[in-house]
Amino acid sequence: MAQRHSDSSLEEKLLGHRFHSELRLDAGGNPASGLPMVRGSPRVRDDAAFQPQVPAPPQPRPPGHEEPWPIVLSTESPAALKLGTQQLIPKSLAVASKAKTPARHQSFGAAVLSREAARRDPKLLPAPSFSLDDMDVDKDPGGMLRRNLRNQSYRAAMKGLGKPGGQGDAIQLSPKLQALAEEPSQPHTRSPAKNKKTLGRKRGHKGSFKDDPQLYQEIQERGLNTSQESDDDILDESSSPEGTQKVDATIVVKSYRPAQVTWSQLPEVVELGILDQLSTEERKRQEAMFEILTSEFSYQHSLSILVEEFLQSKELRATVTQMEHHHLFSNILDVLGASQRFFEDLEQRHKAQVLVEDISDILEEHAEKHFHPYIAYCSNEVYQQRTLQKLISSNAAFREALREIERRPACGGLPMLSFLILPMQRVTRLPLLMDTLCLKTQGHSERYKAASRALKAISKLVRQCNEGAHRMERMEQMYTLHTQLDFSKVKSLPLISASRWLLKRGELFLVEETGLFRKIASRPTCYLFLFNDVLVVTKKKSEESYMVQDYAQMNHIQVEKIEPSELPLPGGGNRSSSVPHPFQVTLLRNSEGRQEQLLLSSDSASDRARWIVALTHSERQWQGLSSKGDLPQVEITKAFFAKQADEVTLQQADVVLVLQQEDGWLYGERLRDGETGWFPEDFARFITSRVAVEGNVRRMERLRVETDV
């Protein structure tokens, strides 16, 4: 026993000596001379918290001092009493360029108080003041989005920092908390809370899809997707939303989301156990009908923002004339009213029947009787686009007022143009949504007939919208060209006609043959106007004046593509030519009734291809649906607005059949209505799934047969 007691006493002495040595205390338990007191300045303690943990050399024991030194409790030790304002974190988890939403900032004082209260009562621990969405998406130094950082382990975050004991450079952090200042040049984004897919019930809606209204630009209806004709994806759970990419001059929404709550997720559907009693096909039909309802609500929500933020803006109104204001917004109030009435009827049907019988009759009635404001709005599109471009380029006051409005959180960081084109987008998507509903009702003859009638009614409306837009554009073009073309050197041609419109116009090099040499000017010397029935060859005198040299009817024209190496020399022989991209146009019967040959050259291969396609336009009409199944298809990834007559305007998510590729440009046929034209290749991605390609062709066939498009 004595030996055991001696060993215990020795262990206590050694332990006491170790504590005093490591904490650098004197015999009385106080800090040794030269060391800061425990209750010193916060700055000294803060700095000390980041010093390396290096054991201090053992202090010599005072002579004659044999009793053990007093033990200091851990809660009263200098380490426990330190109140630092710094923290070392892995560099991989720190992003200096990440902008936080100012509304979510929390003062340091409030944070300290909340921690003290939580220490006394854990139930008072507040919820985090940051959004997980802020941590979910980040950008690496190359600008690429990196996702799921919140799921990244601490070990993965430490990768690349070296071992804990390495000789890496220390990161010096400022001990002061810096307030984040708002950047006035950066557009406000929508609140992160609006990006969360939630079924949170509000007091007024009880789990309604109205709880979290989304902008129509941010969603893509599942009914537009034909990659799986079985449409199993329409039953999938909603994927977590991604942040919308910053919008530049081109309207791009990288992260389309499903249209809010699905029918299967509705509380009344879940509580009543309806899903257990339905077949898979009936559930798909209910989802297709409900998606028309929810997407109409999103569309109506975006139209309301266009009216409240842009149309009714006094600042914007003060920078434009009354005519310019009318051209910009046209009859958008009538369009909004039509959408509200349509949505009210759909919602009333949904409230009356959780398991909706049908909505085809509602859509048919509105397409035939109430959607006529869409025709007037679409007919004004050419004036709308031209007025907007003119104001942005020449009106600084308008440009500044518009920029301020687009920064508002309600606009979601999107430009006004994305709101102005919404009626065109919605009216062209409705036939595709109705086609999906038709597929879901094929097993029920009466429902299928009703859906087919609704599809024909809405497709007829779309055709009227397209014709109205083309008619106004063509009429204005013909009147303008009538004043610019001078026929004084040739027999006059009555240019204005209701059945004539411009296909393409532009400058080309006219190659002239002089003796043994072929001469090409350093600048374009020929300006062509190609209409649907006649080709007019002119010489440009000014920006608004052209002297007509010759013309010929389209059925009296032959076109031949020629490679530079194939050009014969005027004196005979064949050798490489200096003409870069030549092609030959033969006027079999010109304005004087004789044959004339024109050797033309363009400045690029794509321009030559576009001219040849336009000049042979009538010869390409023979290709039928049967041969289009083997053509490549693309999906449009960002909206493209036609700037020339031979280009085609495309919306994001449009599907196009590719008829020709040339030098970064694609010539294709828009699936939804058969419109053809050129567009840049980098605005689209090729569809590689054979199932999706075949599904798109079948959808095109149905739309053409059912609606006579």
Swiss-Prot record:
For the region Required for RHOG activation and mediates interaction with EPHA2, give the residue spans: 275-481
Where the record annotates domain PH, the positions are 501-620
Give the GO biological process terms: activation of GTPase activity; cell chemotaxis; positive regulation of protein localization to plasma membrane; regulation of actin cytoskeleton organization; regulation of Cdc42 protein signal transduction
Biological source species: Homo sapiens
- Enumerate the residue ranges of region (Disordered): 22-70, 114-146, 180-246
State the encoding gene: ARHGEF16
Q: Which PROSITE patterns match?
A: DH_2 (PS50010), PH_DOMAIN (PS50003), SH3 (PS50002)
Residue intervals of the DH domain: 284-468
Query: Which residue numbers delimit the SH3 domain?
Result: 629-689
One Pfam match: PH
InterPro entries given in the database record: ARHGEF16/ARHGEF26_SH3, DBL_dom_sf, DH_dom, Ephexin-like, PH-like_dom_sf, PH_domain, PH_ephexin, SH3-like_dom_sf
> What is the protein named?
Rho guanine nucleotide exchange factor 16
Q: What induces it?
A: Up-regulated by HPV16 E6 (at protein level).
The listed location of motif PDZ-binding motif is 707-709
